[in-house]
Amino acid sequence: MKTIIISDFDETITRVDTICTIAKLPYLLNPRLKPEWGHFTKTYMDVYHKYKYNGTRSLPLLSSGVPTIISQSNFNKLFADELKYQNHNRVVELNSVNEITKQQIFKSISLDQMKTFARDQNHDDCLLRDGFKTFCSSVVKNFESDFYVLSINWSKEFIHEVIGDRRLKNRHIFCNDLKKVSDKCSQSYNGEFDCRLLTGSDKVKILVKILGEILDKIDSGCNKEGNSCSYWYIGDSETDLLSILHPSTNGVLLINPQENPSKFIKITEKIIGIPKDKISSFEADNGPAWLQFCEKEGGKGAYLVKSWDSLKDLIMQVTKM
C-alpha cells in the first residue's frame, strides 16, 4: 500500500523549535543589528495578553459528548469552538510577524546564506529526531511524490536543507515562508512573510487542500495507486491537533512522555481529554510504543506515538506493508 506522509516540522521532524534557530541568523550576519530579538519576544507577549481570547474554547476536545467516530459530516461541528480559537490566534501571530517585517530583520538575507546556515546548524543531522531518516527510507517508497511538510516555520530553504533529501519538492513544503526577491545574480528575502500559514486552523485548511490535490491526480489518472493510499498526518503541538483529528487521515501525536512530560500531560489530558488510565499506560517505561486514542470513519484513527521508529512499526501494522 502506498503511504502518503504529511508532517509538521518543528519538534516533530526536529528535536527543537528551529524558528528560534532561524532568528539567530540576522544577528550572526550583522552583530550590530537592532532591535535585539528580545524586542520581538516582548512584542509577542504584549499582543498575546492584549488580544487574549474571550470566546469559549471547549476543552477537552474529546469530551464524553463526542461521538466515538469522527467523520467528514461531524468534524466542523464537533470542533467549531477550537476552529474559532485557533483562527483567533492569527491576530497574535500576524502582529508578531508584522513587527519583524516592519523592522526589516530578514531583508536582503540571501537564500544561499539561509541554506548554508541550515546545513551548519544541522551538522551530523543533530537537529533531526532519532529515527526520522530510517523512517523515510523504510516507509516512504517515493519521497518525491509522497512526502509533504506542513509547518508554521519561516523558511522553505531552511526546512529543505535540514531534512536533507534532494528528492523533497519545494512545492511539497508549506510554511509561513519569507518572501523572495530576485536580481540578476541571486535571490534574497524581502523581509516580508507569506502569512497564509500561522495557526492550527490554517494548517487544517491546507491539509484539506493537499489531500484534494492528491485526489485530483488520482481522478485524472496520474496516480494509479491512489485507491490503495494510506494518509498520515504527524505533529506534536496544539497547532497540529485539528489536523491530527481530521477524518481524512490517520493522525499522529508524536511525543515521548519521558522526554517532555509537562507538554505531554497538557496536550493529552487537559486539551485532548484522553482518559488517565490510557495516559498512564502509555507513559510507563515498559508501556506501549503507540496507542490509539480515537476512531475515525473508514477505519482510520488518531494515535499517540513515542518515536519515528515506533511510527514505522505502527504504519507497517496498520497498512500490512
List PLM regions with ranges.
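C-terminal cap/substrate-recognition subdomain and adjoining C-terminal extension
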Residues: 123-148, 153-321
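A short, charged/proline- and glycine-enriched loop
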Residues: 1-3, 227-228
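Alpha-helical substrate-recognition element adjacent to the catalytic core
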Residues: 2-177
